[in-house]
Amino acid sequence: MSGLRVLITNNTLAGRAGTELYVRDTALELLKRGHSPIAYSTILGEVARELVKANVPVVDDLYNLAVVPDLIHGQQHMELMTALLHFPQVPAIQFVHNSRSWYEKPVHFPRILRYVAVDHVCRDLLLEHAVPETRIRVVLNFVDLARFRSRRKPLAAAPQRALLFSNYASEETHLPAVREACARASIQLDVVGSQTNTATMQPEEILGEYDLVFAKARSALEAMAVGAAVVLCDYEGSGPMVTPSNFARLRPLNFGRRALSEPLDARVILEEIRRYNPTEAFRVSQTVRATAGHESVVDELSSLYEEVIREFQQNGHCEKLEEDRAAAAYLRQLKIDFTANTAAATRLRERFERVPLVGRIGVALARSFMRGK
């Protein structure tokens, strides 16, 4: 099918976080292929402006959308359900990017015909919520290879410069442990991220300057694509140096939480730094560039879009009573989840506020918890 009109939802299109950038990169590639992506979120900002500049329509109220999409690519369940109820004859796919976020919990609704997990951890979440395995697809995360080009110079024989690449990096999270490990190894460390007021709109322009990058998930994948050696690390814990021997195990985990099984201890991180090997980093980068490019992933998504549209056309429309009851069940669960998460975030914020050195970052993490980031 050509010229599909795809409505992509997300809880925000403001900061440059994982799902926001997934929307941006997917929409831009769809546009390049002759499709008509439209982005919807009630919170607009930097990423929304990037999309508009690239001629992708962005709306924060579906009543302002004068056309009916062929398919809903739904990220975060409240925005997905808003779109499903606004467009009663349109099928949908729910995408799950985060196994711990209440915003990402799977929704049971008659017109959600497929569920996409970006890693095996999210696939497990879908299975735990009674989503039939036949409706689940695992489509691993990707990197825009046209933006994140291979570095021009080979890595140094021993790491000279390192980057901590994380929006959660601060004095109250994993920055001290990483800094101490780098100091022991005589490596200069820079930090890029929102908590240190050093975030950048063009990470692809700086990643190639570093021999070693500490990151997780999408950020780690981008650093690998450029050619840096990568140690998995974030505020939740530390993980291994990514090597040719462990890449196949870590890739289905999205280089994320489940891979961060070690404590945030300078000694642990230093052990991983000592595994630095320019030849192995180059091999990892070649593997990423051969298997994790955005074009092949959007090929897969396009095929899935077409599959869902055909299935919906063949099977006919859903009964209104069935949809109404599914919507009622969703609202009931939404109230339960919202109440539980509001209480948990309040307790977390109050606990952090009582610790002087942790207060600011703790409140930020509590807010992030509520937003599902």
Residue map of PLM features:
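Donor nucleotide-sugar binding/catalytic pocket of nucleotide-sugar-dependent glycosyltransferases
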Residues: 113-125, 132-148, 315
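Acidic anion/phosphate-binding donor-loop and adjacent secondary structure
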Residues: 104-107, 127-128, 142-158, 201-202
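Boundary detector for helix-to-coil junctions that initiate low-complexity/charged tails
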Residues: 321-373
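Short His-centered aromatic/hydrophobic patch
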Residues: 74-79, 96
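Conserved donor-binding/catalytic core segment of Leloir-type glycosyltransferases
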Residues: 7, 116, 137-147, 154-172
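A charged, aromatic-enriched C-terminal amphipathic alpha-helix characteristic of glycosyltransferases
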Residues: 18, 153-155, 260-326
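A short, glycine/small-residue-rich beta-strand->loop->alpha-helix junction that serves as a flexible
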Residues: 10-22, 170-173
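Catalytic binding pocket for nucleotide-activated donors in carbohydrate/polymer assembly enzymes
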Residues: 218-283, 287
